[in-house]
């Protein structure tokens, strides 16, 4: 999995960046998404607040914002088109590989780690996996969705070694 990582806060250690890359690659392997691409940006509460207002119409910061990439194009190409134009096939494959981006609030992660009584490392890993599952179509609006998503989330975190 290819992951672009940006630290807008300049507060995230190399260890946390490496853990984030590692746990996302682990989650991708567990969910069969190894060939996908995504972006992760570490932000402040102020930036999280702006993004939450813009994308979710919620006037407060949040821990992780997950923006799932959904191609808006309804273009379709048959196999002959793709065979005639290998560049087109490559571009479409790249678009198909990109699944979305996460914005993780470093401030919120610190607050929540303290509130929940576990490490900052565990909270950052949790937020990365939680966001990853969201951009892969998982949600928790209904009890059944919540059970499915949270079960997989804990399975990934436990298998990786970030148990509660």
Curated annotation (Swiss-Prot):
<dbReference type="Pfam" id="PF02130">
    <property type="entry name" value="YbeY"/>
</dbReference>
<keyword id="KW-0255">Endonuclease</keyword>
<dbReference type="GO" id="GO:0004222">
    <property type="term" value="F:metalloendopeptidase activity"/>
</dbReference>
<keyword id="KW-0479">Metal-binding</keyword>
<keyword id="KW-0378">Hydrolase</keyword>
<comment type="function">
    <text>Single strand-specific metallo-endoribonuclease involved in late-stage 70S ribosome quality control and in maturation of the 3' terminus of the 16S rRNA.</text>
</comment>
<protein>
    <recommendedName>
        <fullName>Endoribonuclease YbeY</fullName>
        <ecNumber>3.1.-.-</ecNumber>
    </recommendedName>
</protein>
<keyword id="KW-0540">Nuclease</keyword>
<dbReference type="InterPro" id="IPR020549">
    <property type="entry name" value="YbeY_CS"/>
</dbReference>
<feature type="binding site">
    <location>
        <position position="140"/>
    </location>
    <ligand>
        <name>Zn(2+)</name>
    </ligand>
</feature>
<dbReference type="GO" id="GO:0008270">
    <property type="term" value="F:zinc ion binding"/>
</dbReference>
<dbReference type="GO" id="GO:0005737">
    <property type="term" value="C:cytoplasm"/>
</dbReference>
<feature type="binding site">
    <location>
        <position position="130"/>
    </location>
    <ligand>
        <name>Zn(2+)</name>
    </ligand>
</feature>
<keyword id="KW-0862">Zinc</keyword>
<dbReference type="InterPro" id="IPR002036">
    <property type="entry name" value="YbeY"/>
</dbReference>
<dbReference type="GO" id="GO:0006364">
    <property type="term" value="P:rRNA processing"/>
</dbReference>
<keyword id="KW-0963">Cytoplasm</keyword>
<dbReference type="InterPro" id="IPR023091">
    <property type="entry name" value="MetalPrtase_cat_dom_sf_prd"/>
</dbReference>
<dbReference type="GO" id="GO:0004521">
    <property type="term" value="F:RNA endonuclease activity"/>
</dbReference>
<keyword id="KW-0690">Ribosome biogenesis</keyword>
<keyword id="KW-0698">rRNA processing</keyword>
<feature type="binding site">
    <location>
        <position position="134"/>
    </location>
    <ligand>
        <name>Zn(2+)</name>
    </ligand>
</feature>
<comment type="similarity">
    <text>Belongs to the endoribonuclease YbeY family.</text>
</comment>
């Amino acid at each position: 999995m290819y992951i672009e990582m940006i630290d807008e806060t300049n507060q995230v250690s190399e260890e946390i960046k490496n853990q984030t890359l590692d746990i996302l690659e682990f989650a991708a392997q567990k969910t069969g998404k190894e060939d996908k691409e995504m972006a992760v940006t570490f932000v402040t509460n102020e930036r999280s607040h702006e993004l939450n207002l813009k994308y979710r119409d919620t006037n407060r910061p949040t821990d992780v914002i997950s923006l799932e990439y959904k191609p808006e194009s309804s273009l379709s190409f048959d196999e002959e088109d793709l065979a005639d134009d290998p560049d087109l096939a490559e571009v479409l494959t790249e678009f198909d590989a990109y699944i979305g981006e996460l914005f993780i609030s470093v401030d919120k992660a610190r607050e929540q780690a303290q509130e929940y009584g576990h490490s900052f490392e565990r909270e950052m890993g949790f937020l990365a996996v939680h966001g990853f599952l969201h951009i892969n179509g998982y949600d928790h609006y209904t009890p059944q969705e919540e059970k499915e998503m949270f079960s997989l989330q804990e399975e990934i975190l436990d298998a990786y070694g970030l148990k509660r």
